[in-house]
Amino acid sequence: MFEYCMARQFVAGVDEVGRGPLAGDVVAAAVILGEDHGIEGLADSKKITEKKRDALFDVIQERAVSFCIARASVEEIDELNILHASLLAMKRAVEGLNIQPQYIYVDGNKLPKWTYSAEAVVKGDSLVEEISAASILAKVTRDREMVALDEKYPGYGLAGHKGYPTKVHMDALKRLGPTIIHRKSFAPVRAAIEQMNLF
């Protein structure tokens, strides 16, 4: 049940995915649904099945008034830190909309530096349908990228854990060392680099 219900003609929702992983970009999406989108089943992207997310990914793009998927790269994450890189990705997503939003809801408790009228909403992906839609676009995009990267960098299990620090991933880092898609500013990756330099 979505609680934030202001007039929705040009209200955007923004969310990002990929703060916690040790590898890959952080991906953000911004979505303006409009008042009569008729999309059923919107919910926090982490709480619905992959099959349902994939179906909604297509429906959201077909029916949204406007959407944009953006990112901050591994290099930007290492240079700026993950929080500022996440905010940068969200800012890029909003700037990529082909319609200027009248108001923006951002998932979380921090807003990017911008001049838009906006509000940060904690657990917004379950309270604001535009944020939920953005969450789905960002998660499906990033998950698919990690599956593709798993083929390019085999042995790390990226398709399964999507870059998160699971036991499989941590063991692979120790065994194989990090790749160029690993975030060197994250402690487990730094530790793996230091370990490789010992030999």
UniProtKB/Swiss-Prot annotation:
A molecular function GO annotation: RNA-DNA hybrid ribonuclease activity
Keyword Zinc included in the entry's annotation: no
Catalyses which reaction(s): Endonucleolytic cleavage to 5'-phosphomonoester
Keywords: Cytoplasm, Endonuclease, Hydrolase, Manganese, Metal-binding, Nuclease
Any matching Pfam family: RNase_HII
GO cellular component: cytoplasm; ribonuclease H2 complex
Binding site for a divalent metal cation: D15, E16, D107
Disulfide bonds: none
Keyword Metal-binding: yes
GO biological process: DNA replication, removal of RNA primer; mismatch repair
Cofactor(s) the protein requires to work: Mn(2+); Mg(2+)
EC number(s) per entry: 3.1.26.4
Localization of this protein: Cytoplasm
PROSITE patterns cross-referenced by the UniProt entry: RNASE_H_2
SUPFAM superfamilies for this protein: Ribonuclease H-like
Cofactor binding: number and manner: Manganese or magnesium. Binds 1 divalent metal ion per monomer in the absence of substrate. May bind a second metal ion after substrate binding.
Main location (coarse class): cytoplasm
Similarity comment text for this entry: Belongs to the RNase HII family.
HAMAP family, per the entry: RNase_HII_B
Protein name, UniProt field: Ribonuclease HII
Organism: Saccharophagus degradans (strain 2-40 / ATCC 43961 / DSM 17024)
Gene: rnhB
